[in-house]
């Protein structure tokens, strides 16, 4: 099994698209990239930990390639917004692809370059590609939030949904 970590705004909205793919073992919400060990949601929201909300994906590389996950990642985000995603603002919502090895780094960088050259977006692609840091699981109530709270999930993801429909579908 291999790991991938993606940050694309509120982690609630990043779980379902990946969970639905064949070859995915698990998708868990959490925090990474900061300097405070085992942060709470409240600490991360205070913007004092350096962490960003992210999802950790465990996948079977015999069934799905990392490059496929990166392509799906782009389609869940606004890669031109470095200061958060949609209605979620601040460093704790910044878009980042975290890599575990040189292969993942190269795939992510090439994919970002291809997206920039595609002309899909007029603004520069600003999503960061950074070395993976320790990943801390979010509290249980955040896990699989879209299944536990479908109405709240739909409300919180409307702006994202509208952007994705307009720019990716």
Curated annotation (Swiss-Prot):
Q: Which GO terms describe its biological process?
A: protein modification process
**Annotated keywords:** Oxidoreductase
Q: Which reaction does it catalyse?
A: L-methionyl-[protein] + [thioredoxin]-disulfide + H2O = L-methionyl-(S)-S-oxide-[protein] + [thioredoxin]-dithiol; [thioredoxin]-disulfide + L-methionine + H2O = L-methionine (S)-S-oxide + [thioredoxin]-dithiol
Q: So what EC number does this one have? A: 1.8.4.11
Keyword Oxidoreductase on entry: yes
Q: Where is the active site?
A: 10
**GO molecular function ontology, one term from the record:** L-methionine:thioredoxin-disulfide S-oxidoreductase activity
InterPro entries linked to this entry: Met_Sox_Rdtase_MsrA_dom, Met_Sox_Rdtase_MsrA_sf
Reported function: Has an important function as a repair enzyme for proteins that have been inactivated by oxidation. Catalyzes the reversible oxidation-reduction of methionine sulfoxide in proteins to methionine.
User: Which family does the entry's similarity section mention?
Assistant: Belongs to the MsrA Met sulfoxide reductase family.
Record-given protein name: Peptide methionine sulfoxide reductase MsrA
User: What is the organism field in this record?
Assistant: Streptococcus uberis (strain ATCC BAA-854 / 0140J)
Q: What is the lineage of its organism?
A: Bacteria, Bacillati, Bacillota, Bacilli, Lactobacillales
């Amino acid at each position: 099994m291999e790991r991938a970590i993606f940050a694309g705004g509120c982690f609630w909205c990043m779980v379902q698209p990946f969970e639905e793919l064949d070859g995915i073992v698990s998708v868990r919400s959490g925090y990474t990239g900061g300097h405070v060990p085992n942060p709470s949601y409240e600490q991360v929201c205070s913007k004092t930990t350096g962490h960003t909300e992210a999802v950790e994906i465990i996948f079977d590389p015999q069934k799905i390639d990392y490059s496929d996950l990166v392509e799906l990642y782009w389609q869940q985000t606004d890669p031109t917004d470095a200061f958060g995603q949609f209605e979620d603002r601040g460093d704790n919502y910044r878009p980042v692809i975290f890599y575990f090895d040189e292969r993942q780094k190269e795939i992510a960088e090439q994919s970002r370059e291809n997206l920039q050259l595609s002309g899909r977006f007029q603004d520069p692609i600003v999503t960061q590609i950074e070395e993976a840091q320790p990943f801390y699981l979010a509290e249980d109530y955040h896990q699989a939030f879209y299944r536990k709270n479908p109405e709240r999930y739909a409300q919180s993801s409307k702006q994202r949904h509208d952007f994705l429909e307009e720019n990716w579908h």
